[in-house]
From Swiss-Prot:
Protein purpose: Core subunit of the mitochondrial membrane respiratory chain NADH dehydrogenase (Complex I) that is believed to belong to the minimal assembly required for catalysis. Complex I functions in the transfer of electrons from NADH to the respiratory chain. The immediate electron acceptor for the enzyme is believed to be ubiquinone.
One Pfam family in the UniProt entry: Proton_antipo_M
Species annotation: Calloselasma rhodostoma (Malayan pit viper)
Protein name: NADH-ubiquinone oxidoreductase chain 4
Keywords: Electron transport, Membrane, Mitochondrion, NAD, Respiratory chain, Translocase, Transmembrane, Transmembrane helix, Transport, Ubiquinone
A single GO cellular-component term on record: mitochondrial membrane
Domain of life the protein comes from: Eukaryota
Length: 231
């Protein structure tokens, strides 16, 4: 059920990040070097999850692994126990909650029309449903963390915090963000570009689907304009 996936990615997955925040309060704040293996594991997990995304042919699995990779960045940012890291982790949890929920919603609208989640079989929607293609583009740009979205603010905070804490982490951070951009563009091109399905009568977009996407995207843009509400 798509509602379960949306709630799982947007809310329940972020409870793990909240648990890390609470656990870090009882850890020493001075000797953060002891957390270096945990930070490396979190970032390496994010890179591996991103590489797994590149191998996926199932649209829903790709979005699910994308959520895991972003939580790796959140975990690394929270573990170092700096104000910027904590702000970036919390902001990314909120931003990616909206983004992953929107991606699952779009995947479901595609599935309702094609009855398949295989990427190569869902192509050609830019000619049939141009408005849905616009939503796909905006949501993937949010997933890549392009300005002026809240995702950009959060990833900038996380990158600054981790780089100030240990400059070497920029290697895995940069690799993770590069792969994120790669699979996001791959997901957009695979689902929207190419020849449309010839034997499939596609029903038009409904207003409720557009309203759902507006309610996912508008909060992110509004929060980025007044980011001091979170940071």
């Amino acid at each position: 059920p798509i509602a379960g996936s949306m709630v799982l990615a947007a809310i329940l997955l972020k409870l793990g990040g909240y648990g890390i925040i609470r656990m870090m309060q009882i850890m020493p704040t001075t000797k953060t070097d002891m957390f270096l293996p945990l930070v490396v594991l979190a970032l390496w997990g994010a890179v591996l999850a991103n590489l797994t995304c590149l191998q996926q042919t199932d649209l829903k699995s790709l979005i699910a692994y994308s959520s895991i990779s972003h939580m790796g960045l959140v975990a690394a940012a929270i573990i170092i126990q700096t104000p910027w890291g904590l702000s970036g982790g919390m902001t990314l949890m909120i931003a990616h909650g909206f983004t992953s929920s929107a991606l699952f919603c779009l995947a479901n609208t595609t599935y309702e029309r094609t009855h398949t989640r295989i990427l190569i079989l869902t192509r050609g929607f830019h000619n049939i449903l141009p408005m849905a293609t616009t939503w796909w583009l905006l949501t993937n740009l949010m997933n890549i963390a392009t300005p002026p979205t809240t995702n950009f603010t959060s990833e900038l905070l996380i990158m600054s915090a981790l780089f100030n804490w240990c400059p070497t982490t920029i290697i895995m951070l940069g690799l993770s963000m590069l792969i994120t951009a790669s699979y996001s563009l791959h997901m957009f091109l695979s689902t929207q570009m190419g020849p449309p399905p010839s034997n499939n009568l596609t029903e038009p977009s409904h207003s409720r689907e557009h309203l759902l996407m507006i309610l996912h995207i508008m909060p992110l843009l509004m929060i980025s304009l007044k980011s001091e509400l979170i940071i």
